[in-house]
Amino acid sequence: FYKGYFINKKSFIPLIDAKIAISKDYLTINKKKDKWITNKTSRKIVHFLRSRYDCILSTSKSINHDDSLLNCRINGLNNNKPDLFIVDLNLRLKKKLSLNSYIGNRKIYIITNKKNAKRTLVYKKKGYKIILIKRLENKDDFNLLFKKIYKIGYSRMLIEVGLTFLNALLKNKTIHDLYIFKSSK
């Protein structure tokens, strides 16, 4: 319970946990084209997990692929829509996504290193907020980003990304706890 508090006060970053779903053969993409890799119970646990965080970080690649809402869909907790940070360094987030319907109910930030005013204006008009960073290549870059997120007011972050981005976070030792959901298929 106090772990997040101590991390916040010592490092001025959010508590950073991550979750990943993998198939029986350790893949993160479902080749059978089913909507989900894991089962209904795992999904309920993930929705409960999301309810415990004030923000979620994902990537445009993951969101574009899944068209995911990244919210909590448990009765009684379904009003809990953690704010969303989307790492989109090259501004490739699709314009038509299901999560656009939640912009009025939750803050959605796009993290980019592109200063393209025309492209960022399109997202701003939809209600996205833009966070500009120089790069995201090493531990210092990640810590700088996480300090910005903490400074905005977020103290607990759940990361839901693909294997490539997750590996970068693990390599740079920026994750405090990792939840792995392994499918029996």
Task: Describe these PLM feature segments.
Residues L170-K185:
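Flexible, gly/pro- and Lys/Arg-enriched active-site loops
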